[in-house]
Amino acid sequence: MFGKKNLKWLGVVATLMMTFVQLGGALVTKTGSADGCGSSWPLCHGALIPEFFPIDTIIELSHRAVSALSLLMVLWLVITAWKHIGYIKEIKPLSIISVGFLLLQALIGAAAVIWQQNDYVLALHFGISLISFSSVFLITLIIFSIDQKYEAAELYIKKPLRRLTWLMAIIIYCGVYTGALVRHADASLAYGGWPLPFHDLVPHSEQDWVQLTHRIMAFIVFTIIMITYIHAVKNYPNNRTVHYGYTAAFILVILQVITGALSIMTNVNLIIALFHALFITYLFGMTTYFIMLMLRSVRSDKQ
């Protein structure tokens, strides 16, 4: 059960399941299904199996089921990884983070159901689960030795790119929070047209301010990633990890901006909104991979 031969498929399945957790959370919020099981948790309407199954109950129950299965799968993965490749420096801390933040995400989700938290607290939910996803994602990359391929093993990231990448990670995370707040505050269609309602630029409600803040953060995210991408490909032209990685990040942020704009233009089409959540999930995952490589460069400085 915990054999080394299981590591690769466990990593892939756990990463996919964590992706579905992210998308499921976005689906619950977008469809207003957070109260699909009433104020009961872990039961649904006070029962293990509810009497009726309206669509919001099905969506909420499905999200809970996927979250529970993902916890079991992540536990299986981290125990197996700890046992067989725990000698790799990053595996143990990543294992602790992945399980710890997944449990924290579940607790915040439960608190939201039972005590009806305010929007600003609920917006933390997506970001916390994103940290857990990224930890599982990194464990999977290590299992497949991606961190040793494409000149990654001999890569030394200098201070300018380190600073830009840290800034990129912080700004993305702030953008994630404001995006989650847009969903929870029911502000997806606030503040008029995209990119700005030029006929009336002054926000008139809390929802307008939430939406405007997210658009400003999205613009900053795009700008910082573009600057980081240009710096990376210009200064590391012969390193495929940097070239491919930061190019992928730049493509993902472009797709993120496009789906964000289309969400508004289509009155929040559900499929587009889910792609919007998917792209930011993998963009943040890519950024944490850069951070892992950067921390290795920092350790080499100290040796």
Curated annotation (Swiss-Prot):
Cytoplasmic side: 1-8, 89-93, 147-163, 237-244, 292-303
Entry keyword set: Cell membrane, Disulfide bond, Heme biosynthesis, Iron, Membrane, Metal-binding, Oxidoreductase, Transmembrane, Transmembrane helix
Subcellular location: Cell membrane
Bilayer-spanning residue ranges: 9-29, 68-88, 94-114, 126-146, 164-184, 216-236, 245-265, 271-291
Annotated catalytic residues: E60
Alphabetical list of Pfam families matching this protein: COX15-CtaA
Self-association state and partner proteins as the record states: Interacts with CtaB.
Main location: membrane
UniProt binding sites for heme o: H63, H125
InterPro entries on file: COX15/CtaA_fam, COX15/CtaA_HemeA_synthase, HemeA_Synthase_type1
The organism's place on the tree of life at top rank: Bacteria
Function per UniProt: Catalyzes the conversion of heme O to heme A by two successive hydroxylations of the methyl group at C8. The first hydroxylation forms heme I, the second hydroxylation results in an unstable dihydroxymethyl group, which spontaneously dehydrates, resulting in the formyl group of heme A.
Family under the similarity heading: Belongs to the COX15/CtaA family. Type 1 subfamily.
Protein's name according to its UniProt entry: Heme A synthase
One Gene Ontology biological process: heme A biosynthetic process
Keyword Secreted among record annotations: no
Any one Gene Ontology molecular-function term assigned to this protein's record: oxidoreductase activity, acting on NAD(P)H, heme protein as acceptor
Disulphides: C37-C44
